[in-house]
Curated annotation (Swiss-Prot):
Protein name: Acetate kinase
Pathway as given in its UniProt record: Metabolic intermediate biosynthesis; acetyl-CoA biosynthesis; acetyl-CoA from acetate: step 1/2
Free-text comment on the cofactor: Mg(2+). Can also accept Mn(2+).
Family recorded in the similarity comment: Belongs to the acetokinase family.
Cofactor requirements of the protein: Mg(2+); Mn(2+)
Function: Catalyzes the formation of acetyl phosphate from acetate and ATP. Can also catalyze the reverse reaction.
Originating organism: Desulfitobacterium hafniense (strain DSM 10664 / DCB-2)
Cross-referenced SUPFAM superfamilies: Actin-like ATPase domain (SSF53067)
EC number: 2.7.2.1
Residues that bind Mg(2+): 7, 384
Catalytic residues in the record: 148
Enzyme class per UniProt: transferase
Lineage: Bacteria, Bacillati, Bacillota, Clostridia, Eubacteriales
Amino acid sequence: MKILVINCGSSSLKYQLLDMDTQTPIAKGLVERIGLPGAVLTHRPADGEKEIITAEIPNHTVAIQLVLDALVNPEYGVVKSLEEIGSVGHRVVHGGEKFASSVLITDEVMQAIEECIELAPLHNPPNIAGIEACQKLMPGVPQVAVFDTAFHQTMPPHAYLYGLPYEFYEKYKIRKYGFHGTSHKYVSQRAAKLLNRPAEGLKLISCHLGNGSSITAIKDGKSIETSMGFTPLEGLMMGTRSGDLDPAIVSFIQQKENLSSDEVNDFLNKKCGVLGLSGVSSDFRDIEQARDQGNYRAALALDVFSHDVKKYIGSYAAVLNGADAIIFTAGLGENSAEMREAVVDGLQYLGAKLDLEKNKVRGKEADISAPEATCRVLVIPTNEELMIALDTLDIIQKG
């Protein structure tokens, strides 16, 4: 079966068409600047040259029509007809408490996703637009929703509740939800295979480190604690997000800078993190380069970040009562040997120790632990699209 995976942002759309017999993509691509001038589709067949298609793309329906046209194009397409596509899997950012797993999309499911808009006002509306476009353009093809939050629905109340009046949870559903769930789920499953152990009994700490970063404690294959919270702003300092703060700082900044609540929220999401501390960039590669050239603030930003990661690993080791493995994934986790070394240095008490030669790996699955390490350190490139496709296949096969 071939499964189309769709990930819609407000003005962009990423897609992959996967052959589930081999679990590999046969085409992937990106639509940029939806609803803006200069919209473009970049289409990459697995065994061909990339195609760049410029067009007026006023909305997500037009974007998906372009994608479908590209997939069946006689020159650079990869299928003879759309009938070869058995199902569509959609990334949906927020499923609230309503969804603890991926689901076949029905009218009731759509309504529930719409009810979660206030929890993810920037993300859920374009996710919904993508689903509606596919329903219109591919009638009769089963559509599946895969939620970023679902994997974390196994967290116990003592992990997801804040120190606020309980009525705020009852009335407004204020609690920790966690994100990057699809990524954490995928790498935890791969880790069990790499360690040649069943998920049951395994204690894992998964570090998804990139422009957005989160850490998850995984026990018996289930998330029991995670660093992102009610929104993706909580937890680690990130590319442009502040991460954990004393809540009183928010009103202090509002008063000092004369900002509205929307403006201060935007500021904490887009102008803080390593960008704010370094003054250089939100891209860790640029910051590592600046540090190597003697930039003090760049070095400081990297030190704060690695300290943050180490602190969370330590606290999650406490929650798990030890760890069998620490996983590094996502752009920074997969590719920065220096960051991995900075984080693991000082975790010897956990039994974690790097083999510095093995740690040079970039973007490939590897056990980078020293032979004597009792807590393994793994690099596992994430593959959220494959995880979405596998969940979609599972639901279609269950009927």
